[in-house]
Amino acid sequence: MTVNGKPAEHFAGTLLEYLQRHGYREDCVVVERGGEIIVREQFSRVKLHADDELNILHFMGGG
């Protein structure tokens, strides 16, 4: 499994569980897996696999 272009240990769970475990707020991220955007409503249904390539974009506020 790779996350943002870096090797990551395979996580046996859902995308939502992965995001929560790694400190991401699911309402502040966009996730792409294998070239396709995963809509937020699907995060809890998407099972992660050892060969997944994820890109997680985290939005930050500021001014």
Task: Tell me the role of every PLM-derived stretch.
Residues 1-62:
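Ubiquitin-like/PB1-type beta-grasp interaction modules and other compact soluble beta-rich domains
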